[in-house]
From Swiss-Prot:
Source organism: Pectobacterium carotovorum subsp. carotovorum (strain PC1)
InterPro entries according to UniProt: Class_I_gatase-like, GATASE, GMP_synth_C, GMP_synth_GATase, GMP_synthase, GMPS_ATP_PPase_dom, NAD/GMP_synthase, Rossmann-like_a/b/a_fold
Catalytic residues of the enzyme: C86, H181, E183
Gene: guaA
CDD domains the record matches: GATase1_GMP_Synthase, GMP_synthase_C
Protein name: GMP synthase [glutamine-hydrolyzing]
Amino acid sequence: MTQNIHQHRILILDFGSQYTQLVARRVRELGVYCELWAWDVTEAQIRGFNPNGIILSGGPESTTEFGSPRAPEYVFNAGVPVLGVCYGMQTMAMQLGGHVEGSNEREFGYAQVEVKTDSALVRDIQDALSATGAPLLDVWMSHGDKVTAIPEGFETVASTDTCPFAIMANEEKRFYGVQFHPEVTHTRQGQRMLERFVRDICQCEALWTPAKIIDDAVTRIREQVGNDQVILGLSGGVDSSVTAMLLHRAIGDRLTCVFVDNGLLRLNEADQVLEMFGDHFGLNIVHVAAEDRFLGELAGENDPEAKRKIIGRVFVEVFDEEASKQTDVKWLAQGTIYPDVIESAASATGKAHVIKSHHNVGGLPKEMKLGLVEPLKELFKDEVRKIGLELGLPYNMLYRHPFPGPGLGVRVLGEVKKEYCDLLRRADAIFIEELHKADLYNKVSQAFTVFLPVRSVGVMGDGRKYDWVVSLRAVETIDFMTAHWAHLPYDFLGRVSNRIINEVDGISRVVYDVSGKPPATIEWE
């Protein structure tokens, strides 16, 4: 019988910080299961989850404003350790009888806090020593309000010149508050502090490991589907690929993968997917060549959001047609991951705005009447990749740069035509090949080529001709929420440009996108 990898668990209450998912990922990296819930949960929900500890996230609100989010009172009566981060510390302080005020100056960026009192949270953790021998910690602050009086039973553990209560603690109740963000890498000892809280103070064992997650997923898949047949849409992306490998391990030949070649994939990608999963791993794959159908539906359409919806709709139609040909299929597998679940929950409660329609969640054909199998729905992307490695998938496939669900459909600006896709595929392949050769591919977060539907004059031999323009795009980012354009070497860009213009007949000009996010998005459409 497999071990219960969910036995030890942390509950993270989300107050709206851009870093909240990062807190959850850091806890998972410690080998401990956690879930991320909205701050306004009920006592019954918390009791049902039965956490070993609770973390209150940061957030953009002010605890001094009427109606600002508060932690459920039960959090402080549950008898488990609680860690408040930034806003989480402020609401803890205010709700337990302390005081919070708006600060004259917002503290944002690097700070050094001085530890004044021994605490289980930071004992023997330091970056340096002060002139008086006190431990110093390099941390990342991002707050306007600050705690000006701590609740009864708490001690001041650490402070800065402008923040008198950078860390507070009630050791008896195991309540801790930090005014900085331990989850970001700028807080150099942040992961050690989280480890101290999760592993030592909450006494959680490291049960959440790739090998154990695989064993648990295989067991749960077998329990869920029994001897039934399962169908999966395999795209060759990370999520569907790892889903396919997990299901194949669990049920073998009772999995059928439908691979839809929509004509919007990268150069030779369809052949690579079929060779890897069909020939090498031995999965049952139904290959559907649907380029003409997709491009036919996209003809004449220039609007990016409309293109996304057409691509999503046609995929569902094609997949549904193929699924109906499979006899005795009872289950549909999807590569939904935990951030998809969080995002969908936020949309359902009206707490999120749709920037671009999501291509994964919500694409289930209602008329199919199949049960849903989602073996990755508890996992973050980095966990999915680690599991993929454990299952034998190649590193270079799992750690490829992100590729949008609609594929080249949103990298060809305006109307999508086969001619444009073919030119873009070849240009993009040259860019990616040169990034690898120059050892730059893994130094940028995402790189790709965009086809611009404008003609530009060029000189070839003794003649002039008007051909198409492509733009190279490369960005550096930690979380894809913000991004800087990558400062690639000029000689490298020149080499890529020369190769594209000389080797791809039909392209006469190559430009480089130097827009950051914000104001631009990473993808052009």
